[in-house]
């Protein structure tokens, strides 16, 4: 990767961040969006003008357009830790125990936010809520930059330079790509996960495993990184040649490093944080590992709500969700022959998300599947597709970013 490539990507990324944040301010200043939102069955009661009353981490005016929904927990953990007395609590109906909702979220992102907030407070941003919110946006944006550089690098073996740039461009204009600059984990995650993929393809196993480990502690999907790392490890073997000389201690060490994301997940899962996460996922969020029956029922209910009850709000939301999943699924299958490791990582993201027991947030979850952008970049070789997709995607991106800025539900 040359200095020119880095310069071009950094410049485009910086312009994109400024445009996204400015656009949210412009739209919310110029327009008044009517509440509540009927996107899904539960949003009508959660998107009224008074719905955030008492949620102190969502009420700070500074950077408020970038803080909504799950941002509350990341800001709260960054300021007060997991046992923050201001955190929301729910009762487990099975045990009757009170559970702090902060435990639903992984630690690495909010802890990095805490680190970034320290110099901001020293520079005069003394309000801890404001400092944590700005830190969250900075961490997300920097993670996104790292992810874009890694995406460009991992596609170069089979793409022309123009195609790799196009993949980066499509990543930043995907309809839900604004999340990369919000107080959400997607930006940091693609920096770590895409970085791990790119480094492992280059043979930098130690750094790849470290990034993979940190990705695991950013969100649960990080555990899936063990799959592509193992594939890249096995691809080092020349199967038509004698195997014994190739199976050196270094080769076995690389295999062990490839398993680091899975080991990191299991370590975290058996900690107090992991136990709390699993408990909340089951009874509060209704999610689990490949919960196929409950997922089918959730998708059916979402379809019925969109068709019969929610009207245009729900139908558009549901169409974006389904469209994103189908596009990422097709992209993953298309990429298997060209780049099996990245393809299977993306496919695992799609399947684990779609069959998690819930039919929500799919368009956001698909953001972390690199095959999506690689497939679009291939299609974008056709100039008509490139122009058409660019217009369509940017218009949806603007709509989604605007809705998020006023606390409407977009995933």
What is each of the regions a protein language model found here?
Residues 19-40, 214-216, 222-346:
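Membrane-lumen/periplasm interface segments of specific transmembrane helices
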Residues 68-125, 353:
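Short hydrophobic/aromatic helix or loop-helix immediately within or flanking a transmembrane segment
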Residues 172, 176-179, 193-198, 206-233, ...:
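Membrane-interface alpha helices of multi-pass inner-membrane proteins
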Residues 97-107, 111, 122-149, 313-320:
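Loop-to-helix entry region of an early transmembrane alpha helix in multi-pass inner-membrane enzymes
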Residues 182-188, 362:
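Short acidic/glycine- and proline-prone juxtamembrane loop motifs at membrane-interface regions
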